[in-house]
């Protein structure tokens, strides 16, 4: 089958920068999905995304769908003809529905008799007929929360669309998409090349735009050019290092078709303002990269990326310097003003701010968190007074001018202002660390005071919201409780804190008077333990290992984690699958025979067969060895030791009839199996692990 390259380009007004890459990815995926569903063969797929265009190129796209063999079964032969051999209504009706005559049907033999069948080959549709509808559907399915109309058309898109390329080889596909007539003409840079440019073939697309149109259409190429240019400029002009935030880099890439980095300067006096405030101002409002020296100290420099090659770059730089100066002046003013009021004097200002209608104000939450943080601090051998103080001050920076203007600085400015007020160093740090980790893989609190406040704040939210029956749903999690749960688990595990979730949640529950749900603490603990699954999935630990531990519901995260690591190590042992299978068999037997009512005291006088005597002796020997390991939380060593039971367990099941006729013998054997299983259950339910076969 012949192949040619295909190109679609949608020319628009400037697309939302944060949406550009997701739109491009979704557009590409939609076209690929459509081709796969249509059964059209294709080669490499390339995406292009710039401020005024979305494009996809498909290499080696087949010129048609493959022909398809079709088989349609009709009536049974005995129902197709009457006694005289004439076609029945069943046969003629079937043939008529297909637009054929009965003599065009074949006979198919099956185990249920002979049937008439129509066999034919459906010709595949030409690709040029398929692509317009496929592109239209891909565009309609893009994740656009708010679409707009323009002109007299009813067509909707995220921004007005002005031109369209649909090329297959060197031929334009003449079929409208989004009420636009396709062509082979694109448009260059809005200022450097404000005219139409002919794209002869799909292979010429980005070359024409780059060489004639002053447009780098490839998002990844443009992104790396900006990264390299910004880094080189910082080193060349200032001997410094540009700090490149990846999200900002994506946004700047989406704003520029022809990026040109330029360096500007601001007054040294602004460096007296915390660097985070300067960075936030430059990043959020102006999309500037900041520059640091070899010691990572901020320099009074910034790098902006212009979307054109100016004849007078100094004018562009000067313009940007004039724009940033008022922004930085505002930050300096906020910083100076905020420091005139101590954080403790702002506590009363938290009372009008609602946390949640039923759970009260931010002030109410602060009081609860302070009480809980104090208890947590005591439990982790930290200073409870510092934790209580930090929790009461934790949200006070929310009412400062700086944080009201730059919300991403919450906690960060709290630390600066607390230090300015002369608060204890750990208290000041805790005001920032309360929000850690802010995202997956983020840093954790470095101080125990910070750990106590971070955990207390999250647990208070979890218990409060679950307690008024407002847990997260499948689509809504407005208070980010999933992230809060994972944050608590990470802090406890990675900082190795001896905390029990059940206890902490019960402490939190005691601080509320408005909860309506029963067993809130246990419900929250179950929810948090369920979050462990995603935590371990990211680490490549299989679900069965998590489920084996989860079945025992250990409520100390550190203990839970040690068990998971131990079971994961046990799973790699050669004895693991056999012992998992044996545990599953034992579990089934015990469940059928009464489960919890079965004891585990073995009467050696009732042991008859050599295999059960050996197993009983080995189980008792292992019990003496592993019980101290359990007490120390050394689950890995315990499971490694218990792996030696594989051989006597296998022999027992090969040679011993558990369900003996004699009640006493039978019950004794059940007790032996129960004792065996309970040893493993001290760690996890390994019957849930994969078994041999």
Swiss-Prot record:
<comment type="similarity">
    <text>Belongs to the class-II aminoacyl-tRNA synthetase family.</text>
</comment>
<keyword id="KW-0067">ATP-binding</keyword>
<dbReference type="Pfam" id="PF02092">
    <property type="entry name" value="tRNA_synt_2f"/>
</dbReference>
<feature type="region of interest" description="Disordered">
    <location>
        <begin position="65"/>
        <end position="84"/>
    </location>
</feature>
<protein>
    <recommendedName>
        <fullName>Glycine--tRNA ligase beta subunit</fullName>
        <ecNumber>6.1.1.14</ecNumber>
    </recommendedName>
</protein>
<feature type="compositionally biased region" description="Basic and acidic residues">
    <location>
        <begin position="65"/>
        <end position="74"/>
    </location>
</feature>
<keyword id="KW-0648">Protein biosynthesis</keyword>
<dbReference type="InterPro" id="IPR015944">
    <property type="entry name" value="Gly-tRNA-synth_bsu"/>
</dbReference>
<dbReference type="GO" id="GO:0004820">
    <property type="term" value="F:glycine-tRNA ligase activity"/>
</dbReference>
<comment type="subunit">
    <text>Tetramer of two alpha and two beta subunits.</text>
</comment>
<dbReference type="InterPro" id="IPR006194">
    <property type="entry name" value="Gly-tRNA-synth_heterodimer"/>
</dbReference>
<dbReference type="Pfam" id="PF05746">
    <property type="entry name" value="DALR_1"/>
</dbReference>
<dbReference type="GO" id="GO:0005829">
    <property type="term" value="C:cytosol"/>
</dbReference>
<dbReference type="InterPro" id="IPR008909">
    <property type="entry name" value="DALR_anticod-bd"/>
</dbReference>
<dbReference type="GO" id="GO:0005524">
    <property type="term" value="F:ATP binding"/>
</dbReference>
<keyword id="KW-0436">Ligase</keyword>
<dbReference type="GO" id="GO:0006426">
    <property type="term" value="P:glycyl-tRNA aminoacylation"/>
</dbReference>
<keyword id="KW-0963">Cytoplasm</keyword>
<dbReference type="GO" id="GO:0006420">
    <property type="term" value="P:arginyl-tRNA aminoacylation"/>
</dbReference>
<dbReference type="GO" id="GO:0004814">
    <property type="term" value="F:arginine-tRNA ligase activity"/>
</dbReference>
<keyword id="KW-0030">Aminoacyl-tRNA synthetase</keyword>
<keyword id="KW-0547">Nucleotide-binding</keyword>
